[in-house]
Design a protein with these regions (language model features):
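Flexible loop and strand-edge segments within Gram-negative outer membrane beta-barrel domains
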Residues: 224, 229-233, 281-321, 325-331, ...
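Short, small/polar-rich motifs associated with maturation and membrane association
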Residues: 4-349, 363-364, 775
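Conserved small-residue
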Residues: 219-281, 379-380, 384-387, 655, ...
Length: 989
């Protein structure tokens, strides 16, 4: 209603829900405006009744409405999904999606947030972007970040992509998922060329959220997650393991006729399953170590609060995120007032501010920080060389410890131990008495950017300058270093019932004794090689103009980076990059990119290099002959594109490769009497190679983007082929004679070819009853082949690495079983433990035909441990407040090596790996394991090589979102309640 010059109205979305914070401004005069309140209402004073208002909101189509003469009028804004997708983040800038001719895929923070219960961005990316391959090797709290490759592996030195957060090289772990606006993955040469020596393995651009003009919007999210081990080996219990041991001993009687004495009587074996009393239960243990060590589930929590909004002068986004990851290991009472085990807590804070200093000047400030607090048993940190061993001791119960060797803890409080084999550990004791240590990682990142519109010089010209400073500080070894475990350790001999106590021996007195309890409280120390600092500054010019149907853009950038770890000499990089694009009528596209890069990792002669790329595109759907299909909404968009270029990589493992290096050799003297004429001497530890330079990769890419039937079907097809040259081969991997005297020089001698394709299909359908169903499906195939790696020239072809994939598995090839002693005698003999072979062993192929099975007969088998094919399918629906989706992820063409050996070290650990061979003609799954005898390592054949293919139900969710009624009365725009699960089911071979 218009009373004099006052206008009242309400802003709604297409579902009839009110919109909070919508912008309402007078057309032609942005100084007259307001925003809608919590109920979507607004009041605005306008000059006259003929005024026109522009109503807008992020992610929706803006509306122009004329002021009505009476009554409260309503403005309905519709979702603008095309608007949300029309801008793609590219290297050092943004481009309209329609004009992108490079291989770039993008997802949003909203998509990543579907993976509730996952706090790591890398893990959340799994399956959501074609071409991105993730491999997670650890579930330790705080160590869940997966290894990421883009389009597979192309170098044995380094295949990690460059990760940039808001334009600066930073780990993705420094950002919480709720703060992510978008993630772009740059895959081909045209997309990555502006990064020069840093872009050979692809680039991941993480863009964080920023504020928009309007009322403050507060978002609160919280979830609790229960985690259980996904898959553990199936071990036989004591009864079945001892029965299996008797079978194995009988099988070996021809080698050891006196081994009858090792066979357990059935009456004794029965006691392991059905002990008569506590004494028998302790003498004849039957321990399910997995049940002892692990909780039924571990709890993890994640909570986030963020607020965004702003005025014409300042726009803001601020976020606080908390993560807690619980421990699967159970808690044991150790009587020492501390609990060992694992855990991780992290707090992330972020504030992004945009100041509109003048109409043409914007000053941006990003300040972020994180504090990660990781708890482990003492020395079980990934920064310590003993970590792998210590962690293995704690997991040994789940994998290796026999169920009958001892109890974790006896009724008198003594810990179980095994005196006959020193490396048999009590995992429960290790978890309980492992001490406790905290590793605190503090990260602070700051960005200051000034953006200036220079249209007063020439239309479309702008400049940007930025400086950033990051600091990472790590403190570890704060906690309890448990030096001596509990004094009471015992073992009960099941054959005699005799109790043995663990004792130590004093060399000075000759007495043995039981150690007492002792530990140190450690105050912590700075981890020098994990403390990092990074200084980066950039200056950039951009120009964008349209001349009729001719659209031109230019970008030029200078960047310098200084990084240092601990007290080392800083690393330096310098980049001069440019990009130029041209398109005619948004139909024909040309792009050329380049970068002149410098790195101090190489000699002055090789310190700088120029890398460039070009791309072309054709928007077929904009051609006049496609008008018939477009008008009938059969074809929405069809674009064909191609790119080619050369990119570099300076991410070599070692510095100073171009210099001769010397190391301390020792002291000596010039006389018989070492006190006279002493001197110190040094040795040449590494021979330098002044010609060491960048690894280079030439990338060729063809792509098709399509959309049909008004967006019902959309997607893309990519075909790529890369050739990487000048790959560094380390001195220890080179073929040189032993009399050279030291390692050979590291040199650029390697070549690898990578090829593959990507398929993506998106389905989106909204029905008349407002039900929406959608599906995103993708597949990536990426394979590589080593062309050269300085193999010894006289090696047989199958013994070389050239001709096979990086990481190609090799095995001794088996061809069925030895079914009789005639087979044993008539088969190729082994050069070690040949006399120990028996019927039931594998028939190992003499691959090189020299009559003997030895180390030279190991041949390529299966694939590498990086999958060639990855698949993703996400299906969902939305109707009114209800929503649900499921996501499946799968891989194939991958080989895993999992060596679980039954009866290892004569322990009664037996794995359920299928049926054993027992006589000729059996359809056996594996050979009959040994208990006493030893076979050569060749005899395992391919037993421990598995097809690593799997299909996983990676994510599933059912939810309901409240948007009106009681929710609005609480001042809440919407409230979502959901049940979500991750890695719920897996099928594997």
């Amino acid at each position: 209603m218009c009373i004099r010059d006052r206008v009242r109205g309400t802003v709604l979305d297409s579902n009839g829900e009110t919109i909070i914070g919508a912008s309402v401004v007078l057309k032609g005069n942005n100084s007259i405006g307001t925003i809608s309140d919590i109920d979507g209402n607004f009041v605005l004073t306008v000059p006259n009744e003929k005024s026109t208002l522009i109503v807008s909101y992020v992610g929706m189509k803006p509306q122009e409405v004329k002021v009505v003469s009476k009554g409260l009028f309503k403005v309905v804004l519709e979702d603008d999904t095309k608007q949300l997708e029309e801008v793609v983040v590219v290297g050092y800038g943004q481009q309209k999606k329609a004009s992108v001719v490079g291989a770039i895929t993008q997802t949003t923070g909203k998509v990543l947030e579907r993976a509730a219960g996952i706090s790591d961005i890398g893990a959340a990316l799994t399956g959501n972007l074609p071409g991105v391959i993730t491999t997670q090797s650890s579930g330790m709290p705080g160590e869940e970040e997966p290894k990421i490759t883009i389009r597979g592996t192309s170098s044995w030195n380094n295949s990690d992509p460059l990760v940039l957060v808001d334009g600066i090289e930073r780990p993705m772990s420094s950002v919480d998922i709720a703060s992510v606006q978008s993630i772009s993955v740059l895959k081909d040469a045209s997309a990555t060329a502006v990064y020069g020596v840093k872009g050979a393995n692809g680039v991941i651009l993480v863009t964080t959220k920023r504020g928009t003009e309007g009322a403050a919007q507060i978002n609160i999210a919280a979830n609790a997650t229960m985690k259980i081990p996904s898959k553990l080996p199936n071990k036989l219990d004591s009864y079945d393991a001892l029965m299996a041991r008797n079978m194995a001993i009988e099988h070996e009687l021809s080698l050891y006729p006196d081994s009858w004495s090792y066979i357990k009587p059935q009456s004794i074996i029965n006691k392991y399953r059905n002990p008569a009393n506590l004494e028998e239960a302790e003498r004849y243990p039957n321990v399910d170590w997995q049940d002892v060590l692990f909780k039924d589930y571990a709890m993890s929590y994640n909570a986030n609060v963020n607020v965004s909004g702003g005025t014409r002068f300042v726009k803001y986004f601020a976020s606080v995120d908390y993560v807690h990851e619980g421990d699967l290991f159970d808690v044991f009472d150790n009587g020492r007032d501390y609990n060992s085990g694992y855990g991780y807590d992290r707090i992330n804070v972020r504030s992004n501010l945009d100041f509109q200093i003048t109409k043409s000047t914007v000053f941006k400030v990003n300040v972020a920080g994180s504090n990660g607090y990781k708890k482990t048993p003492y020395n079980n940190s990934n920064y310590d060389s003993s970590a792998d061993w210590s962690i293995a001791q704690q997991w040994a119960g789940a994998y290796n410890i026999a169920p009958d060797v001892f109890l974790p803890k006896y009724s008198d409080g003594s810990w179980g131990y095994y005196p006959n084999i020193s490396n048999v550990t009590n995992s429960a004791e290790n978890v309980s008495l492992g001490g406790t240590m905290t590793t605190t990682t503090t990260q602070i990142t700051t960005d200051f950017a000034l953006e200036q519109d220079l249209s007063f010089i020439t239309k479309g010209l702008s400049a940007r300058a930025m400086v950033s400073w990051d600091n990472t500080f790590v403190e570890w070894k704060r906690g309890i270093n448990d030096l001596y475990n509990d004094a009471q350790h015992k073992w009960i001999n099941p054959d005699t019932g005799e109790v043995s106590y663990k004792k130590s021996y004093d060399n000075n007195t000759g007495f043995d004794f039981m150690q007492g309890v002792m530990w140190n409280t450690e105050g912590g120390e700075v981890k020098n090689w994990a403390t990092q600092r990074n200084l980066n500054y950039q200056a950039q010019l951009n120009w964008a103009r349209s001349f009729g149907k001719h659209n031109v853009t230019l970008m030029g950038l200078f960047s310098r980076q200084e990084t240092a770890t601990g007290s080392e000499i800083p690393h330096y990089r310098e980049d001069w990059a440019f990009r130029t694009t041209y398109n005619w009528a948004d139909r024909y596209f040309i792009e050329y990119n380049g970068a002149y890069n410098g790195s101090e990792k190489f000699s002055k002669e090789n310190r700088f290099a120029f890398f460039n790329s070009g791309a072309i595109g054709w928007m077929v759907s904009e051609e006049p002959f496609m008008k018939f299909l477009k008008e009938r909404r059969i074809l929405d968009m069809l674009k064909i594109r191609a790119s080619y270029g050369e990119i570099g990589d300076d991410n070599v493992k070692t510095r100073w490769l171009y210099m001769n290096q010397w190391a301390y050799g020792g002291t000596s003297s010039l006389d018989v009497d070492r006190g006279e004429s002493p001197y110190t001497w040094y040795r040449e530890s590494a021979v330098g190679n002044s010609d060491v330079h960048w690894e280079k990769v030439k990338k060729l890419n063809f792509g098709i983007d399509y959309s049909f039937l008004d967006g019902l079907f959309a997607g893309s097809v990519e075909v790529f082929r890369d050739k990487r040259t000048d790959i560094l081969v380390g001195g220890s991997d080179r073929a040189i004679p032993s009399y050279f005297g030291t390692k050979a020089v590291t040199a650029n001698l390697g070549k690898v070819r990578t090829k593959g394709y990507e398929l993506e299909l998106r389905i989106n359908k909204t029905f008349s009853n407002k039900m929406r169903v959608w599906a995103n499906m993708s597949m990536t195939h990426a394979e590589n082949k080593i062309l050269e790696k300085d193999d010894a020239p006289l090696l047989a072809g199958y013994q070389k690495v050239a001709g096979y994939a990086i990481g190609q598995n090799k095995a001794y090839i088996d061809n069925g079983y030895l079914n009789s002693y005639d087979d044993v005698i008539g088969s190729p003999q082994h050069d070690t433990n040949n006399s120990q072979r028996l019927p039931g062993d594998y028939y190992i192929v003499d691959f090189n035909g020299d009559g003997v099975v030895d180390s030279k007969d190991q041949a390529p088998y299966g694939y590498s441990d990086t999958p060639q094919n990855t698949y993703n399918a996400t299906l969902g629906f939305e109707w009114k407040g209800f929503s649900a989706f499921v996501q499946f992820y799968g891989v194939n063409n991958v080989t895993r090596v999992v060596q679980l050996t039954s009866f290892g070290s004569q322990m009664n650990t037996v794995y359920d790996q299928g049926s054993w061979w027992s006589e000729a003609g059996d359809a056996a799954d594996v050979v009959t394991p040994r208990w006493l005898s030893k076979v050569s390592g060749y005899s395992n054949g391919t037993q421990y090589y598995y097809d690593g293919s799997y299909i996983r139900l990676k994510n599933a969710e059912i939810a309901y979102t409240f948007t009106d009624g009681w929710v609005r009365k609480l001042g809440v725009k919407n409230l979502k309640i959901y049940l979500n699960g991750n890695n719920l089911w897996v099928w594997s071979k």
